Amino acid sequence: MISNRLAVLVCVAMAMMVGGSALCAAQSEGFFASWEDRVRDTLAQQPSWPIPLVTASSGLLQVARTDFVRQIAPARTDTWNYGNTKGVNVVPWYKIEFDVLVPPYIQHNSKAEDGFGDFSMLLKYRLAAGNEAHGNYSLSFSLAGTLPTGSYKNGSLDATISPTLCGGKGFGRLDVQSTLGAILPAGDTAKLGRVVVWNTATQYHLGKFFWPEIENNATFYHGGANDGRVQDFVTPGLMLSKFKLERDPRNRLALVVGGGMQIATTHFHSYNHGLVLTARMLF
């Protein structure tokens, strides 16, 4: 059984690894210039697809991101999620991404108490990649850790660890990205159960900025109150990517926006529809 202590250690280890690397690098000259060159070279070796609306990217990212989600439940109550556990992603080392994910604020519009969700961090390693001229694919593995910092039951009862495998392949203007992962609680496993999450996104590049997409977001419950159940959503969406904010071709500063609607396709679902709006600043 995974312990609470292990989940905390995963989060602390992530922070120490990245912080230690940054501290050592900062002691040398040209820290920021070296960082920029490393990020530029690293990202140039993978496809330039935009991050899907819900599915995690199969490549590495250096981005600040926030999402806004409105979930409409079968009882016709709606819940707003401000932030949706997004934050800042950086590439501190070659082939490695580190994310600090800000707790979302949950507004229920019901008798449930509003409040903040859990704090999370994520470490991703890119296993293999080729840009559009060299295979047009990417493959990575990530490990996320979540701490139960939520207020008024707006987070998990215990810390969790989430290993995920992410892959993507491009075919001209079309790309398909898919992730398969699990959410493993550190305690109260009989009550919370274990969850397997499988997301797949298909995107098509139209014109200069338009990326229409269709996603499938599936969740499989093992143990807990929803043992044996499956929840699935089909999510049509549109990403607008990317609007460069500087003329310098070496400058990566750019804006990406998008939106879509999750539509429940299974008999069991915690909400009928989910409006998802997103804004990302690449840097």
What residues fall within each predicted segment?
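Cleavable N-terminal export/targeting peptides
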Residues: 1-35
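Transmembrane beta-barrel domains of Gram-negative outer membranes and organellar outer membranes
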Residues: 24-283
